[in-house]
């Protein structure tokens, strides 16, 4: 399942540099996560780094992009060319 940033985002910019896949960018009003690039840090880290650093806990699982651990790993391999 990809992650998403809720409208509670305060645009503090701490999440964007933490994403190893470059999935986070500045949107019109808040930061956004590109679901096709978000692996919840599977393949890179044990936990989602953006969630760890967010000071307002506004990064949650995106219910419209449900994925299994295997699907996230396959996405990681596709993005990085590893596997």
From Swiss-Prot:
It comes from the Bacteria. The gene is fdx. Its cofactor is [4Fe-4S] cluster. One of its GO terms (molecular function) is metal ion binding. [4Fe-4S] cluster 1 binds at residues 9, 12, 15, 54. Keywords: 4Fe-4S, Electron transport, Iron, Iron-sulfur, Metal-binding, Repeat, Transport. GO terms for cellular component: cytoplasm. This is Ferredoxin. It holds the Pfam family Fer4_7. Binds 2 [4Fe-4S] clusters. Residues 2-29, 31-64 form the 4Fe-4S ferredoxin-type domain. Ferredoxins are iron-sulfur proteins that transfer electrons in a wide variety of metabolic reactions. [4Fe-4S] cluster 2 binds at residues 19, 38, 41, 50.
